[in-house]
């Protein structure tokens, strides 16, 4: 048993050595093939270049010069040509103008470029050319408000021209006496709207006038003016008052 085991071990070691040697020889052969291919490739390129130099020599009548001299001259010419082509490419890229849809055959590109540069450097200069309107103070005079609104009407849409009336009252078919700042202690509290009737007595008119003058002095606000009524308006007011008085009052 021991002899057989040793024999198998020796056989296994021999196989490993053989496999290792085979791998080494295979890698060497592979490297040799790669080197030969590289050498052949370089040699073929060199032969091809010398063949071109020979044709170039014959075409230009340089029979008195060797192939090495011709290759040197060709290499210099190629270098100069490559350099001049790169310079021409740079010049053409500098002269190339960007296309703009609003320009006709690129005639306005200089102006557009200058205006865009100005906007980038100082963007506020573009806003300085726009029409500027000073905002109107809420406490300014009525003339200034009217002039501003008239100028605003010409340049703004219709829905911006509406101004809520603060100082005018609607016209009614009868006279109104309105105290807008009446408080709980005011004699007109609870009856802010007073309809003047033709049947009122002189005493009530006198009391109402005294109360109104007292309120005007205390509040120092302009009292709304009364509009004159026509005969038809007076008749309509009388009919309304008659209807109101004819309604039955609730007894306590």
From Swiss-Prot:
Annotated region described as Disordered, given as residue ranges: 1-23, 84-110
Subcellular location: Cytoplasm; Nucleus
Keyword Transport appears in the UniProt entry: no
A GO CC term assigned to this protein in UniProt: cytosol
GO molecular function: transcription coregulator activity; transcription corepressor activity
InterPro entries: Srl3/Whi5, TF_Nrm1/Whi5
Pfam families tied to this protein: Whi5
Bias (Basic and acidic residues) ranges: 1-15
Key words of the record: Cytoplasm, Meiosis, Nucleus, Repressor, Transcription, Transcription regulation
Purpose of the protein: Has a role in meiosis.
Family statement: Belongs to the WHI5/NRM1 family.
Protein name according to UniProt: Cell cycle transcriptional repressor whi5
